[in-house]
Curated annotation (Swiss-Prot):
Keyword Transmembrane helix: yes
Annotated InterPro entries: G_GB1_RHD3_dom, P-loop_NTPase, RHD3/Sey1, Sey1/RHD3-like_3HB
Protein name in UniProt: Protein ROOT HAIR DEFECTIVE 3 homolog 1
Organism superkingdom: Eukaryota
A single Gene Ontology CC term: endoplasmic reticulum membrane
Keyword Disulfide bond (UniProt): no
Source organism: Arabidopsis thaliana (Mouse-ear cress)
Basic and acidic residues bias: start-end ranges: 785-795
Length: 795
């Protein structure tokens, strides 16, 4: 049969006649009557009795249910099959009524009592009140119809590990004239006899009936004969079921109640155990039901939490960036979820409820922990960025590095702790120390990075200052090498190094660094300054040959007033050459080693003796040693670290220097000789004597013919004019061959120019006075200067 609903009542077949528990229908029934909302405020009433004894009729009148009743006109037969469940109408608290299949029915036969025992045990296990429906005329009879039923009830009660204390309400039907006060003692005596006759376990052999049951007796008139009186008695009995679980009520001292939300599952599990013919451990069953139901409630709340809009929105905000009041908001959401669990699981076993609550809380915390970690990550990142910006700004306005780093570190860590406190939720004692430690490491790493960068900048700054202060001055000093060069370099080095070290030390004072580190940086700057000089000295040493040639050329080709020399032949070329070479050798000796210390050396003397005065060197070799003082790769008492040019290299450089400057000296000698030749136009004496001897006849011929003298005079004048016009001495200063070529090119134009001038003068009137003639000659001369350039143009 299907579930039946009528106004104010709802019934369902809980277990069918074949003993099959109807899970789906009972679940729908529980939802329809909203049993889960009742908590512990509900009662279960069941009725037992012989078949066709009016059980369903009694329940329908007493509780307003709609169980199927037997139609007396159709004969007596089985009406209720299995176990039916209904909710009473108009009774508080919520009361569930179970109508059990009647006992001693012919449909099952005498031998099939298994279902009777199973249903009886089931009713005792889940009912708070058990109605025993019996006929009045059976009281006091040895073979009464209710005796097998009572034996069955007492026997199955022994199968409960820890039996509940159940109220057993005997309803005496069709009461006769015998007063209830007389019937009740007889009934109780019969009940006690049955109890005593039932075999019991050792633990309960002496246990009185009152430890298991509260026995109540009520009598009702015949429904068929005295219907009105029956209904009045039913109404009175109904009042006893109002607030039945309150202290003093019919079920006021019940124990081990299963919360209403677990009723369906509990009944299912109890029936399974009973069907398997196992002893029913109700306390263990209660724990089991609590475990399953609390687990279901916890899972349900966890699933609801996952889909909770507030949580989803909060999680999305966390993914997007920092969230304010995260801890407070999440605490509220978690608290609401756990409160809902507590509300639904409050009536289950406390140990199980607490355990499952803890598991739910752990699952929830495990779910929200990534969001919490993200929040901490946002906080850490934000604080780190704030520290970087604030720290850099503080350094930018000139605040000391150490004080700025310490002040902002403290401020940022305080802010981090405050923001972490705002992110903590009440339900968890999460540790933020790891994130805090990471933030500390990140800040310290940034401080270290900035410190390294700033120290590097300071080092680079002062190194650049040192390089700028030393590089060019040292180069200039080494270029003009003299006896005071290295002394001046040392003073410059000392002055600039001390200035840079002082500035660096002042700058480092704000870094709060160890003395050892500071000294190391100062030492590094000092070494750098020395390195600048050494590097520049090495660069100049590489160019020493070029510098020597430049110095030689400067001194050799210029006089004391720095004017270019004109080799007239009067200069002491040997002395000039020696002076220039001495100056070049001075440069070589200065560049041979680095002299930043106070250690003396004999390099200049050695070079002078070995290279400039070979005679003295030969004497020295004969008297002192037979070895060459420059035949070595090191200088005496000079370490190799200070050596720029070794003795062997000096000798090689000097040899190359002399070779490359030899041409300059040779050119000077040639210039002197050419100058001497240019200033002496008389032939040698032997040539004059030869001319006199050989030209005597020609001379005498001229004396005898005066006309030859006139011709010779004119030829002399013409030759002198050509001499002047052609500038023959000037042309031959450049050499004989170039002079001849130049003169030959200008000869014909010059002759033609002279002829034109003479012709022009012959055409002028002779009346001009001498002054006018001179003026005319001057004008003509100015118009046609005897310059070869004019002649060239004319040509």
């Amino acid at each position: 049969m299907d579930a039946d609903k009528s106004e104010g009542c709802c019934s369902v077949q809980l277990i069918d006649g074949d003993g099959i528990y109807n899970v789906s229908r009972i679940d729908h029934f529980i939802k329809d009557v909203k049993l889960a909302d009742c908590g512990l405020s509900y009662a279960v009433v069941s009725i037992m009795g012989p078949q066709s004894s009016g059980k369903s009729t009694l329940l329908n009148h007493l509780f307003g249910t709609n169980f199927m009743e037997m139609d007396a006109f159709k004969g007596r037969s089985q009406t209720t099959k299995g176990i039916w469940l209904a909710r009473c109408a108009g009774i508080e608290p919520c009361t569930l009524v179970m109508d059990l299949e009647g006992t001693d029915g012919r449909e099952r036969g005498e031998d099939d009592t298994a279902f009777e025992k199973q249903s009886a045990l089931f009713a005792l296990a889940i009912s708070d009140i058990v109605l025993i429906n019996m006929w009045c005329h059976d009281i006091g009879r040895e073979q009464a119809a209710n005796k097998p039923l009572l034996k069955t009830v007492f026997q199955v009660m022994m199968r409960l590990f820890s039996p509940r204390k159940t109220t057993m309400l005997f309803v005496i039907r069709d009461k006769t004239r015998t007063p209830l006060e007389n019937l009740e003692p007889v009934l109780r005596e019969d009940i006690q006899k049955i109890w005593d006759s039932v075999p019991k376990p050792e633990a309960h052999k002496e246990t009185p009936l009152s430890d298991f049951f509260n026995v109540e007796v009520v009598a009702l008139s015949s429904y068929e004969e005295k219907e009105e009186q029956f209904k009045e008695q039913i109404a009175s009995l109904r009042q006893r079921f109002m607030h039945s679980i309150a202290p003093g009520g019919l079920a006021g001292d019940r124990r081990g109640v299963i919360p209403a939300s677990g009723f369906a599952f509990s009944a299912d599990q109890i029936w399974r155990v009973i069907k398997e013919n196992k002893d029913l451990d109700l306390p263990a069953h209660k724990v089991m039901v609590a475990t399953v139901r609390c687990e279901e409630i916890a899972n349900e709340k966890f699933a609801h939490f996952i889909t909770n809009e507030d949580w989803r929105k909060l999680d999305e905000e966390v993914q997007a960036g920092p969230v304010s009041n995260f801890g407070k908001r999440l605490t509220t959401i978690l608290g609401s979820c756990l409160s809902e669990y507590d509300g639904e699981a409050t009536f289950f076993d406390e140990g199980v409820r607490s355990s499952k609550r803890q598991q739910l809380e752990e699952k929830l915390l495990q779910l929200v922990n990534p969001a919490f970690q993200d929040v901490l990550g946002h906080i850490r990142w934000g604080i780190l960025e704030k520290f970087k910006a604030s720290f850099d700004k503080a350094l930018g306005i000139g605040e000391g590095f150490s004080s700025a780093s310490q002040d902002w570190f403290k401020a940022c860590m305080t802010q981090f702790d405050e923001e972490c406190a705002g992110a903590i939720i009440e339900q968890a004692n999460w540790d933020t120390s790891k994130v805090r430690d990471k933030l500390v490491r990140d800040i310290e790493a940034h401080i270290s990075s900035v410190r390294t960068s700033k120290l590097s900048e300071l080092t680079s700054l002062y190194e650049s200052k040192v390089h700028e202060a030393l590089s060019e001055p040292v180069e200039a000093l080494l270029d003009g090498a003299n006896d005071e060069t290295w002394s001046t370099v040392k003073k410059l080095h000392r002055r600039e190094t001390e200035s840079a070290v002082s500035g660096l030390s002042s700058a480092l004072a704000g870094f709060d660094m160890e003395e050892e580190t500071r000294d190391r940086m100062v030492k590094s700057l000092q070494d750098y300054a020395r390195g600048v000089i050494e590097t520049k000295a090495k660069e100049e040493a590489v160019r020493v040959l070029m510098r020597m040639k430049e110095r030689f050329g400067t001194i050799f080709s210029h006089d004391s007033d720095s004017m270019p020399r004109v080799w007239t032949g009067k200069e002491d070329l040997r002395a000039i050459t020696k002076s220039a070479r001495s100056a070049s050798l001075k440069l070589l000796s200065v560049m041979a080693v680095i002299r930043l210390g106070d250690e003396p050396d004999n390099i200049e003397k050695t070079l002078t003796v070995a290279l400039l005065d070979p005679t003295k060197n030969d004497t020295s070799k004969k008297s002192i040693t037979t070895s060459d003082p420059l035949a070595s790769s090191t200088w005496d008492e000079v370490p190799s670290s200070r050596t720029l040019i070794t003795p062997v290299q000096c000798k090689s450089i000097w040899r190359q220097f002399k070779t490359e400057t030899e041409y300059t000296v040779t050119q000077a000698i040639s210039a002197q000789e050419a100058n001497r030749r240019g200033n002496n136009w008389l032939p040698p004496p032997w040539a004059i004597l030869a001319l006199i001897v050989l030209g005597f006849n020609e001379f005498m011929t001229l004396l005898r013919n005066p006309l030859y003298l006139g011709v010779m005079f004119v030829a002399f004048l013409l030759a002198k004019a050509l001499w002047t016009q052609l500038d023959i001495p000037g042309e031959f200063r450049n050499g004989a061959l170039p002079g001849l070529i130049s003169i030959s090119a200008k000869f014909v134009p010059t002759v033609m120019n002279l002829i034109k001038n003479l012709a022009a003068q012959g055409e002028d009137p002779p009346a001009a006075n001498p002054e006018n003639r001179r003026s005319s000659n001057n004008t003509s001369s100015s118009e046609n200067p005897p310059d070869h350039k004019s002649s060239s143009k004319e040509d």
